[in-house]
């Protein structure tokens, strides 16, 4: 399934001339319940991602959750991802930075946009400037998230690309009786709003049949939905880029 999904995503992005990085998790270490599906584990998971790179010919990224994973992951992945819940973990950020690989740091739901600067410093302190920041919503009371699009220009001021995670941003954390729920119907609205706000890329969870996904199904989009979003996003992106010189700076 991983190879087939990667190939279909590659083909969609190729048709639209949109750069694409394939993300899959070898371990979903932050699931709500002990009974929740976590993935194949680091050894088998990295083997699968290595196959995706070799056979589908795309770059790959995955989460690292502990410094013990960084070395092995860095030998396979083209980019390392720091999960939102771990974005303040100094040792993990330092270890990821020392690999020299690009590092995508997801902003925690509990973190203000301006407070991502220390996370950047922990990586640049390892002489690694290859950083991406990802906005994925902020806690809004219990079991809910809200997306403040001001976060995008705030985090862009430091000169690093900012990505918007449109699918995790519609998640309803732990609201599904032992799992997270979600409101996938709002993914297009948030994705297109983020592009209009100036984000440099979109993070989107995609599954052929979201209702059958073993993780995050309630906030996923299917392939047809993805293509619709990307087509619209590309048109908005063109407008935003054409008027970028007129955009006020913070």
Regions found by a protein language model. Give the residues of each.
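Alpha-helix-loop-beta-strand connector modules within alpha/beta enzyme cores
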Residues: 8-16, 37-61, 96-102, 152-164, ...
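Structured C-terminal cap/extension of enzyme domains
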Residues: 193-250
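Short beta-strand segments at enzyme active-site cores
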Residues: 18-25, 59-64, 164-166, 200-207
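Glycine-rich, proline-tolerant flexible connector loops at the mouths of alpha/beta enzymes
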Residues: 1-2, 20-42, 207-217
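Catalytic alpha/beta core domains of metabolic enzymes, predominantly
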Residues: 100, 104-206
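Active-site-adjacent loop and "lid" segments of alpha/beta metabolic enzymes
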Residues: 35-43, 81-86, 142-149, 170-195, ...
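A short alpha/beta connector and helix-capping loop motif
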Residues: 2, 6, 10, 70, ...
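Catalytic beta/alpha-barrel core
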Residues: 39-41, 55-69, 78-91, 102-113, ...
């Amino acid at each position: 399934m991983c190879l087939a999904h990667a190939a279909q995503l590659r083909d969609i992005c190729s048709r639209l001339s949109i750069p694409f990085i394939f993300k899959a998790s070898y371990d979903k270490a932050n699931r709500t319940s002990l009974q929740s599906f976590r993935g194949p584990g680091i050894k088998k998971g990295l083997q699968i991602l290595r196959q995706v790179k070799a056979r589908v010919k795309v770059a790959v990224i995955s989460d690292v959750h502990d410094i013990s994973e960084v070395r092995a992951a860095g030998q396979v992945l083209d980019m390392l991802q720091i999960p939102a819940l771990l974005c303040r973990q100094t040792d993990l950020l330092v270890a990821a930075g020392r690999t020299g690989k690009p590092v995508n740091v997801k902003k925690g739901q509990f973190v203000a946009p301006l407070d991502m600067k220390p996370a950047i410093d922990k990586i640049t302190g390892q002489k690694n400037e290859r950083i991406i920041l990802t906005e994925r919503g902020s806690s809004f009371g219990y079991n809910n998230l809200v997306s403040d699009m001001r976060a995008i220009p705030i985090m862009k001021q430091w000169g690093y690309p900012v990505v918007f995670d449109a699918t995790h941003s519609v998640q309803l954390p732990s609201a599904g009786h032992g799992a997270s729920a979600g409101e996938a119907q709002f993914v297009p609205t948030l994705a297109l709003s983020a592009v209009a706000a100036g984000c440099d890329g979109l993070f989107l969870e995609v599954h052929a049949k979201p209702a059958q996904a073993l993780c995050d199904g309630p906030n996923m989009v299917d392939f047809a939905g993805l293509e619709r979003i990307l087509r619209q996003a590309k048109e908005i992106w063109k407008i935003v880029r054409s008027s970028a010189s007129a955009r006020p700076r913070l």
